[in-house]
């Protein structure tokens, strides 16, 4: 059991007539316009650019797959609320807490997939290993926004300055 997932371990041979499902990500029919803003949410499931930390998000094509879904399935929303962005070094215990490289790599993958060049807002107030998720992965929420459609007001972010006030899994 981990992260709310259960696993069944088979102890004997068995046969099954179960047919695998062919589930595909949904594609939105919502389209933005001059007077309609589009907003989406996307859980990136601990995305990070460090393939040396045990998960190979770059080598396995996760950045490109996510970018393709944002462009082709979500139709490049004006604002995207992101969950579970890891810091630049993933689960490496090196004190890094910034996710600017993770977010920049995602922005570049989206642009390469035919989407806009998003700007991003990182949660720069993360303390090392203080917010739950994969140990020292320093997951956080973040936002991508299309600067051709919306803007960010400097100083409008609120900091959690007391890192002990952040929720943890422990």
Predicted regions and their residues:
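Divalent cation-coordinating acidic motifs and surrounding scaffolds
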Residues: 7-170
């Amino acid at each position: 059991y981990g992260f709310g997932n259960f696993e069944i371990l088979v102890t004997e041979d068995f046969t099954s007539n179960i047919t695998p499902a062919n589930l595909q990500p949904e594609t939105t029919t919502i389209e933005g316009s001059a007077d309609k803003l589009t907003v989406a949410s996307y859980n990136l499931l601990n995305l990070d650019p460090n393939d040396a930390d045990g998960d190979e998000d770059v080598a396995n094509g996760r950045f490109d797959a996510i970018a393709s879904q944002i462009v082709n399935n979500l139709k490049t929303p004006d604002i995207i609320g992101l969950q579970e962005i890891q810091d630049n070094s993933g689960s490496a215990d090196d004190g890094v807490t910034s996710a600017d490289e993770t977010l920049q790599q995602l922005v570049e993958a989206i642009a390469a997939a035919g989407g806009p060049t998003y700007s991003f807002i990182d949660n720069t107030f993360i303390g090392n290993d203080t917010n739950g998720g994969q140990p020292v992965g320093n997951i956080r929420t973040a936002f991508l926004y299309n600067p051709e459609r919306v803007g960010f007001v400097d100083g409008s972010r609120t900091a959690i300055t007391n890192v002990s006030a952040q929720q943890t899994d422990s």
